[in-house]
Amino acid sequence: MINLAGVSIFDCEDSAFHRHIVSFGMSELYYDPQSVQEEFSGWGFEFSMRVAPFADDPDSDLGDGNVAPNEPFWVISVMQNLAKYVHTSKKWFEVYHFMPANSPIRLNTDTKLVGVAFAPDPVLGGIDTPNGRVEFL
């Protein structure tokens, strides 16, 4: 699979309010007898990004009459592009890797961010699964 299987966005109240975006699909999502006891599950990681709400981000209709304000959909695009890179190049990311983007990582904004650094998620860290280790980067 070249694309991610999905992405979840969580509201976090820890210290300053932020959105926590976590991918799924870079690791084995389902029990696979052929993957049991492998060192790493799938590529061995999932993307995890924490961002503060940005006033210019669009709102999202939750379908139940409620609206989630300022959804960071741009992060999903970044994660999808990184997933495509991994699947196409067969090169994966590990803790403390850096990848230049050669342009701002977020279009149509005045950001100075032109690369992605991979660090362990401070809350999720990593887990051992029946299919191998998964780090949240």
PLM regions and their residue ranges:
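Short linear motifs embedded in intrinsically disordered, proline/glycine-rich low-complexity segments
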Residues: 1-137
